[in-house]
C-alpha cells in the first residue's frame, strides 16, 4: 500500500511538471506566490489555532461526501498549478492531502461544492466532528476556496476562454465561462470568513451559492493579433491535449491495476453492507432541484462495528494510497486545536435536527451475514451471562465474487444454526429435580476416560426431560384439583387444639374413615372401635386448657377442623376418656389373652422336651468323654455339669486341628443310634432296613455294616433340632414380659371394674355401654384369673426343670436354660453336616481303593478311640427307650 501511494504521488508530480514546463514563467511565479500565501495563512492565521484539516478528516470527507459525486470531468487539470518540487520536499502527507483536497474543492462546480458543504454539516457525527464544528469547517472551506480557486479556474475553462472575446496567456487570472454563459470568479479573501464565529447560530446555515456578480472578470486581457491568436490557439491545444491524454492513460492504467489488486485481496469471510443509514433529498434544501438526492452516509454499523458502503464506482477503491476511507481510522478525531471533547458533556447548544426524510425506496435484499468466530466454550456456572462480544472494529469488506458469495451463504447458514442453538443453550431453562453426585476435577496431565467423550454425539431431549423431571411434572395429574381449589378455596377452620396434635388426629380420622357421630355412638352404646383409633385418642388427649376452649366454643361446628369436631363431640359425653379406656380394654383383652395362652403352652412343652431321650444320651456321652479327658485331675469323676458347658465343645480341638470334641461325640452317638434303630425294627416285625447276608446271625451282620449304621444314626441325631422346636420358641420369649402382661391385664380389669362401680353408677344411666361393660367385666375376670394361675404354675415348672439339670440352684435366670439349649442345637446341626460330609468322602475313597467289598476286615477307628461307649450301646439300648 505504501509503494502504491508513492508511485501515485510521483505520477501526479510528473504530470504537473509537464504542465508547468509548457506554461509561462511569470504566471507560475504569481500563482505560486498566492499558493504559498494561502499555506502561510493556514498555518499562521486565526483558523490555525482552532481548526486543523488533518489527513484522516480529508479521508472521511472524501468517503462520506465526495466519493459518489466527483466525476472524471471535474478533475480536469487537477494538480497543475503548484510548485511540486518545493511542496513535496517541505510538506508532510497530511499537508499534501489537505492541499489536494483544497484544489479539488476549487475545481468543483458551485452546485457540487455547495452540496459538499451541506453534506459536511449533515454528517458531522459520521465524520467524528461535533455539529457546531462541522458548520465552522464548511465555512472555513468556503473561505479558503477564494484563496486557491483563482489558480485553477483559468485552466479548467481553457477551451471556453479561447472561444471568448479576448483570450490571453497573460499571468493574470482570466475569466471562466459557465454553462450558462456567465463569467464566474472566486470570492475575495475579505468577503469570506477565515475562522468560525464565537457565537454560533442554533439553526443550520443555508447552503452557500455564489451570486451572479461574483462570477464576473476581475480584469480585461489586452488585444492580440490574428496570427498570434492562431499560434497561441494551437499551442494551447497541444499543451492541453497531450498532457491530458498522457495523464488519462496513466490514470486509467492505475485505476484498473488498483482495482484488480483490491479484488484479489478480498477475503472470503468479508462482506459489505450497502444499505445507507440515512437518505436525504436535495429537494429539502432551499433553491435545489427536487430530482437531486443527497447521498447518504456511506458508513453503516453492524454487529462488528462501522463499515464503509460500496455504492457505485468509488475512486477510493482505485486510489487507496491517497484517499483512505473512514474504515482505516480507528479513532475519530475532532477538528479542534488540540484535545478531544466529549459530546455528551459539552456545554455548547445543540443544533436543530434536519427535517424528517421521506420514506426511502425498498432496499435491495440484504447480503448474507459474515461468518462468525467459533462458539465460545460453555459457561462455568449455570445461568451465567454469555461473554461480551469483541469490540467493534472498523474494517473494510469488499464485494465478494459469486462463488465466494455462495460459499459465504452456506457458511453463514451453518453459523446461524449454531448461533440459534447457542441462543437456546444460553436461554433460561426450566428448573429440574437435582441429581446428587460427586464431581471429579479434571486432570489435564493424566489421561482420563472423560477426555474421550465427544460432546456433540449426544443431545438431551429438553422437552422429555422437563416433562419427566421438572418440578411441576409430578403434579400434572392434580392440576384440575388445584384449579378447583384455587377457584373455590376452602374456608379457614377454627383451630382450638395444638397444630401438630390437630394434624395427627385428622390424619388418623381420615385414614380410618370415621366421623365424630360414629365415635359418639360407640361411647354411648358400647360399640366396638378400632384399637389404633382408641390408642391415638388416648395418647393425644387434649389438655385442660384445650378442653376448656372446646367447652366454651358456641359457634358453628362446621367451622371447626376435623380433630376439633371429634374432640368437641367427646367432651360433651360424661367420662368420655374413661369410656375410651374401657373400650380399649374390651377390644384388646381377647387378643392379649390368646397370645399369653399360646406362650404358656409352648413353655410347658419346652420343659418336657428338655427331658428327651436323645438329648439326655448326648449329655451322657459328653459327661463320660469329659471324665476321660479330665482323668487324674480335680475335674475328673464328675457326676453332672451345667448346661453352659455345651457351648464349649467346639473350643476343644484334636491333634489335626480340625476335629473338635463335639465331632467326636456326634460320631459315637450316630453309630449307637443306628444300631439301636435297626434292632428295634427287627423286634417289631418290620423288615430290616438293609439287605442281610445271614438270617441266623442278624446281630453280627448289624455290627459289620458300620457305614450303614452311621448314616442311619446321623439322620436320627440331625432330627433332634426339630424334636426340640418348642425349646427354640421359648428361648425367644421373655419371662418377665409374660408376667408383666398378665399383671397389666389384671390392673386394667380392676380399673374398669372400679369405673363401673363408681362413676357409671353415679350417672344412673341404662345405656348400651353400661350393659356391655358389666358383661365384659364378668368375662374378663374369669380370663385374667386363669392367666394368673397359669403364670404361677409355669414359673414353678421352669424352676423344677432348672433344678433337674443344675441341682439345687437358687438363682432364677428366667428362660436362660432354653437359650443355652437353642444355641447348642445350632452347633449340633453344623457338626452333623460336617460329619456326614467327611463320611461320604471316606466312603468314596474306600470304594476307589477296592476295599468296599470287605468293610469288616478293617478295624473301625471309632472303636479304638472310644470303645467303652460302643460296648455299652447294646447294653443300654433297652433302658434308653
Curated annotation (Swiss-Prot):
The chain crosses the membrane at residues 236-256. Residues 422-854 form the FH2 domain. Residues 1-24 form the signal peptide. Its main location: membrane. Keywords: Membrane, Signal, Transmembrane, Transmembrane helix. Residues 194-223, 333-427, 683-703, 837-881 are annotated as: Disordered. One of its GO terms (molecular function) is actin filament binding. This is Formin-like protein 10. PROSITE patterns: FH2 (PS51444). GO terms for cellular component: cytoskeleton; membrane. It is a single-pass membrane protein. Belongs to the formin-like family. Class-I subfamily. Residues 351-390 have a biased composition (Pro residues). Residues 870-881 have a biased composition (Basic and acidic residues). It comes from the Eukaryota. Residues 400-424, 846-865 have a biased composition (Low complexity). The keyword GTP-binding does not apply. Gene3D superfamilies: Formin, FH2 domain. It is found in: Membrane. PANTHER family: FORMIN-LIKE PROTEIN 10, FORMIN-RELATED. Residues 333-346, 692-701 have a biased composition (Polar residues). Pfam families: FH2. The keyword Membrane applies. InterPro entries: FH2_Formin, FH2_Formin_sf, Formin-like_plant. GO terms for biological process: actin cytoskeleton organization; actin nucleation.
Amino acid at each position: 500500500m505504501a509503494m502504491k501511494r508513492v508511485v501515485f504521488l510521483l505520477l501526479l508530480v510528473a504530470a504537473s511538471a509537464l504542465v508547468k514546463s509548457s506554461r509561462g514563467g511569470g504566471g507560475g511565479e504569481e500563482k505560486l506566490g498566492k499558493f504559498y500565501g494561502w499555506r502561510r495563512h493556514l498555518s499562521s492565521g486565526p483558523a490555525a489555532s482552532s481548526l486543523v484539516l488533518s489527513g484522516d478528516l480529508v479521508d472521511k470527507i472524501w468517503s462520506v461526501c465526495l466519493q459518489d459525486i466527483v466525476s472524471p470531468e471535474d478533475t480536469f487539470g487537477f494538480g497543475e498549478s503548484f510548485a511540486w518540487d518545493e511542496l513535496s520536499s517541505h510538506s508532510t502527507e497530511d499537508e499534501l492531502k489537505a492541499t489536494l483536497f483544497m484544489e479539488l474543492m476549487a475545481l468543483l462546480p458551485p452546485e457540487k461544492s455547495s452540496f459538499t458543504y451541506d453534506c459536511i454539516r449533515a454528517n458531522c457525527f459520521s465524520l467524528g466532528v461535533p455539529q457546531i464544528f462541522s458548520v465552522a469547517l464548511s465555512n472555513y472551506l468556503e473561505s479558503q476556496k477564494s484563496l486557491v480557486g483563482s489558480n485553477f479556474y483559468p485552466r479548467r475553462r481553457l477551451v471556453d476562454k479561447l472561444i471568448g472575446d479576448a483570450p490571453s496567456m497573460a499571468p493574470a487570472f482570466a475569466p471562466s465561462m459557465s454553462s450558462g454563459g456567465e463569467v464566474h470568479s472566486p470570492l475575495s479573501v475579505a468577503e469570506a470568513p477565515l475562522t468560525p464565529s464565537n457565537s454560533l447560530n442554533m439553526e443550520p446555515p443555508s447552503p452557500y451559492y455564489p451570486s451572479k456578480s461574483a462570477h464576473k472578470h476581475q480584469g480585461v486581457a489586452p488585444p492580440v493579433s490574428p496570427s498570434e491568436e492562431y499560434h497561441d490557439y494551437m499551442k494551447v491545444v497541444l499543451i492541453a491535449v497531450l498532457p491530458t491524454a498522457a495523464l488519462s492513460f496513466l490514470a486509467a492504467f492505475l485505476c484498473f491495476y488498483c482495482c484488480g489488486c483490491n479484488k484479489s485481496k478480498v477475503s472470503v469471510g468479508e462482506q459489505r453492507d450497502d444499505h445507507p443509514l440515512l437518505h436525504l433529498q436535495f429537494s429539502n434544501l432551499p433553491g435545489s432541484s427536487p430530482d437531486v438526492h443527497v447521498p447518504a452516509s456511506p458508513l453503516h454499523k453492524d454487529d462488528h462495528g462501522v463499515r464503509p458502503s460500496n455504492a457505485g464506482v468509488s475512486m477510493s477503491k482505485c486510489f487507496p494510497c491517497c484517499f483512505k476511507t473512514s474504515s482505516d481510522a480507528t479513532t475519530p478525531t475532532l477538528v479542534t486545536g488540540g484535545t478531544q471533547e466529549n459530546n455528551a458533556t459539552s456545554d455548547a447548544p445543540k443544533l436543530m435536527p434536519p427535517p424528517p426524510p421521506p420514506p426511502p425506496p425498498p432496499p435491495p435484499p440484504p447480503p448474507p451475514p459474515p461468518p462468525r468466530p467459533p462458539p465460545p466454550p460453555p459457561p462455568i456456572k449455570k445461568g451465567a451471562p454469555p461473554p461480551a462480544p469483541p469490540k467493534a472494529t472498523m474494517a473494510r469488506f469488499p464485494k465478494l465474487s459469486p462463488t465466494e458469495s455462495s460459499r459465504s451463504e452456506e457458511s453463514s447458514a451453518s453459523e446461524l444454526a449454531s448461533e440459534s442453538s447457542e441462543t437456546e443453550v444460553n436461554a433460561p431453562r426450566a428448573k429440574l429435580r437435582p441429581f446428587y453426585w460427586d464431581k471429579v476435577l479434571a486432570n489435564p496431565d493424566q489421561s482420563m476416560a472423560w477426555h474421550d467423550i465427544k460432546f456433540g454425539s449426544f443431545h438431551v431431549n429438553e422437552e422429555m426431560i422437563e416433562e419427566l423431571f421438572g418440578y411441576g411434572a409430578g403434579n400434572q395429574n392434580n392440576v384440575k384439583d388445584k384449579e378447583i381449589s384455587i377457584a373455590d378455596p376452602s374456608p379457614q377452620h377454627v383451630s382450638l387444639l395444638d397444630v401438630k396434635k390437630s394434624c395427627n388426629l385428622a390424619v388418623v380420622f381420615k385414614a380410618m374413615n370415621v366421623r365424630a357421630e360414629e365415635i359418639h355412638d360407640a361411647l354411648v352404646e358400647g360399640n366396638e372401635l378400632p384399637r389404633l383409633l382408641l390408642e391415638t385418642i388416648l395418647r393425644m388427649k387434649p389438655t385442660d386448657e384445650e378442653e376448656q376452649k372446646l367447652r366454651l366454643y358456641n359457634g358453628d361446628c362446621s367451622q371447626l377442623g376435623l380433630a376439633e369436631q371429634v374432640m368437641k363431640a367427646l367432651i360433651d359425653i360424661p367420662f368420655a376418656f374413661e369410656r375410651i379406656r374401657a373400650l380399649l380394654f374390651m377390644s384388646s383383652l381377647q387378643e392379649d389373652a390368646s397370645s399369653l395362652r399360646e406362650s404358656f403352652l409352648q413353655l410347658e412343652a419346652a420343659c418336657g422336651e428338655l427331658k428327651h431321650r436323645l438329648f439326655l444320651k448326648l449329655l451322657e456321652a459328653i459327661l463320660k468323654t469329659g471324665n476321660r479327658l479330665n482323668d487324674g485331675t480335680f475335674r475328673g469323676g464328675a457326676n453332672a455339669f451345667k448346661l453352659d458347658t455345651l457351648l464349649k465343645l467346639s473350643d476343644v480341638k484334636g491333634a489335626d486341628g480340625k476335629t473338635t470334641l463335639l465331632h467326636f461325640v456326634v460320631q459315637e452317638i450316630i453309630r449307637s443310634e443306628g444300631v439301636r434303630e435297626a434292632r428295634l425294627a427287627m423286634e417289631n416285625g418290620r423288615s430290616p432296613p438293609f439287605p442281610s447276608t445271614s438270617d441266623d446271625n442278624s446281630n453280627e451282620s448289624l455290627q459289620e455294616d458300620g457305614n450303614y449304621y452311621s448314616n442311619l444314626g446321623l439322620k436320627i441325631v440331625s432330627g433332634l433340632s426339630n424334636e426340640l422346636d418348642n425349646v427354640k420358641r421359648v428361648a425367644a420369649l421373655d419371662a418377665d414380659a409374660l408376667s408383666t402382661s398378665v399383671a397389666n391385664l389384671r390392673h386394667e380389669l380392676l380399673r374398669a371394674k372400679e369405673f363401673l362401680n363408681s362413676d357409671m353408677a353415679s350417672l344412673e344411666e341404662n345405656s348400651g355401654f353400661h350393659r356391655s361393660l358389666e358383661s365384659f367385666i364378668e368375662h374378663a375376670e374369669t380370663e385374667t384369673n386363669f392367666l394368673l394361675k397359669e403364670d404361677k404354675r409355669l414359673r414353678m415348672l421352669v424352676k423344677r426343670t432348672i433344678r433337674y439339670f443344675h441341682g439345687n440352684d437358687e438363682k432364677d435366670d428366667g428362660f436362660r436354660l432354653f437359650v443355652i439349649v437353642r444355641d447348642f442345637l445350632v452347633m449340633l446341626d453344623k457338626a452333623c453336616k460336617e460329619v456326614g460330609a467327611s463320611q461320604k468322602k471316606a466312603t468314596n475313597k474306600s470304594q476307589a481303593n477296592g476295599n468296599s467289598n470287605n468293610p469288616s476286615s478293617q478295624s473301625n477307628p471309632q472303636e479304638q478311640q472310644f470303645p467303652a461307649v460302643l460296648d455299652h450301646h447294646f447294653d443300654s439300648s433297652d433302658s434308653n427307650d
